[in-house]
């Protein structure tokens, strides 16, 4: 389960599918990490073992606890390079000992050559190549061990686009092809209590779905410090 009733319905299989790669992308502060943390909490409730690869070095254990995550039972890794992060992900998946791995985020998977290089050096296509190699290797193991792997990705703007969408995600096209489910998450409005903003109205579109019909969408509220509002969803349903 994703922690959102509406999104579980939109996904068509009652939540995120096991043995698959899932990509969640959206602008900054749209609720990508919150959605993943909610899914981890649900997975743990069902006795699952979860891992969080925090390439952004931004994991907040206090917030995670508020969302119902047993932090002491969560495998947490904060790798230094993109290679290290993907190697850890592959090792966890191959072990067959974890049910769900979250990588936060693809944009933060910086290749070693880029970290060790000079500021002005050109590293065109390095990250895309890294992702492509890793996913080719990973998908077989994911299928075999029936692990769910979720990649979080940010949206960037392409410069000088005249036609079509100027939005793009980092890390090349490999993830688009290898992901069985792609979720586009957006903040559509604010939730206020008096003058105070207490949360965000959120919309998730299922852009790609290989396990059920795609293009469904769900709307729900994410409250600051609390996560997805179950009550709000029940009332809406």
UniProtKB/Swiss-Prot annotation:
SUPFAM superfamilies: P-loop containing nucleoside triphosphate hydrolases. It is found in: Cytoplasm. InterPro entries: AAA+_ATPase, DNA_recomb/repair_RecA, DNA_recomb/repair_RecA_CS, P-loop_NTPase, RecA-like_N, RecA_ATP-bd, RecA_monomer-monomer_interface. ATP binds at residues 26-33. Keywords: ATP-binding, Cytoplasm, DNA damage, DNA recombination, DNA repair, DNA-binding, Nucleotide-binding, SOS response. GO terms for molecular function: ATP binding; ATP hydrolysis activity; ATP-dependent DNA damage sensor activity; single-stranded DNA binding. The keyword Magnesium does not apply. It comes from the Bacteria. SMART domains: AAA (SM00382). GO terms for biological process: DNA recombination; DNA repair; SOS response. CDD domains: RecA. Its main location: cytoplasm. One of its GO terms (cellular component) is cytosol. Signal peptide: none annotated. Belongs to the RecA family. PANTHER family: MITOCHONDRIAL DNA REPAIR PROTEIN RECA HOMOLOG-RELATED, RECA. NCBIfam families: tigrfam_recA. Can catalyze the hydrolysis of ATP in the presence of single-stranded DNA, the ATP-dependent uptake of single-stranded DNA by duplex DNA, and the ATP-dependent hybridization of homologous single-stranded DNAs. It interacts with LexA causing its activation and leading to its autocatalytic cleavage. This is Protein RecA. It comes from Neisseria sicca.
